[in-house]
Amino acid sequence: MAISNTNLLQTKKPISLPLLAFITLFLMLLNRVNSSDSLSFTFDNFRPDQRDLILQGDAKISSGGDSLQLTKTDTSGKPVRGSVGRALYYTPLHLWDSSTNRLASFQTTFTFVLSSPTNNPGDGIAFFIAPPETTIPPGSSGGLLGLFSPDNALNNSLNQIVAVEFDTFVNNNWDPSHRHIGIDVNTIKSSATVRWQRENGSLATAQISYNSDTKKLSVVSSYPNTQANEDYTVSYDVDLKTELPEWVRVGFSGSTGGYVQNHNILSWTFNSNLQSSRAKKEDIYIKRYV
């Protein structure tokens, strides 16, 4: 018995408008996930054969492969004077989009240990953001933390670098009168600081976040395994789009001068998100369905 095509067509139910809207919304959300420019990585520890880090100066992966050692030690493991080392993640970060003027948000968390054989440690570490081609400035050991040359350390018009420093030695020319965590914007003189009590040889944690909507750079640090039980917090309002180029690299720097300590990073995670112009347009359509 023959069945007419007309009857077959009549038995098919049309797709309902709510279902069509749901499918459209789902496809937009799926597309939006792929419309952001993000950088994400995690180091639970560091391997001697690490290939996704750029090591500069005296920085190296410890022989045991458990930490990133920023400054030099002698054969007995004691820190030496006048050492500078930096480590940067190999893949550049798209910090802002010149075609849309949109700016990325990011968050990074790391653990570190600073240890010294004396009660006068120097000089500290910094998490920093700089142009992709950045290298160690000449003469930047000691209080300059491997970030600035002596000639332009206090001239913010000659630098492109934003850093969060964990400073253990007071340099009277630019530091407050105590050990501190500071936010540096194109100069070694911090724009915002908080007094910081360094715990020799203890594990420290730090979380640094940037909100692209509020333009606020925030820092929280603590020593979770000590009796201190104190969070050190500092923040600063800064438009990174006006201070840094569109593409940058992120990393760590450490230095010793006349006084010394070991500077070791034990773990590091980083996550950023830069929404594209396509995702912004899709947000408008998504709101119509929600």
UniProtKB/Swiss-Prot annotation:
This is Agglutinin-2. CDD domains: lectin_legume_LecRK_Arcelin_ConA (cd06899). Glycans are attached at residues 155, 200. GO terms for molecular function: D-mannose binding; metal ion binding. It comes from the Eukaryota. Keywords: Calcium, Glycoprotein, Lectin, Manganese, Mannose-binding, Metal-binding, Signal. Mn(2+) binds at residues 165, 167, 175, 180. Binds one manganese (or another transition metal) ion and one calcium ion. The metal ions are essential for the saccharide-binding and cell-agglutinating activities. Belongs to the leguminous lectin family. Residues 1-35 form the signal peptide. Ca(2+) binds at residues 167, 171, 175. It comes from Cladrastis kentukea.
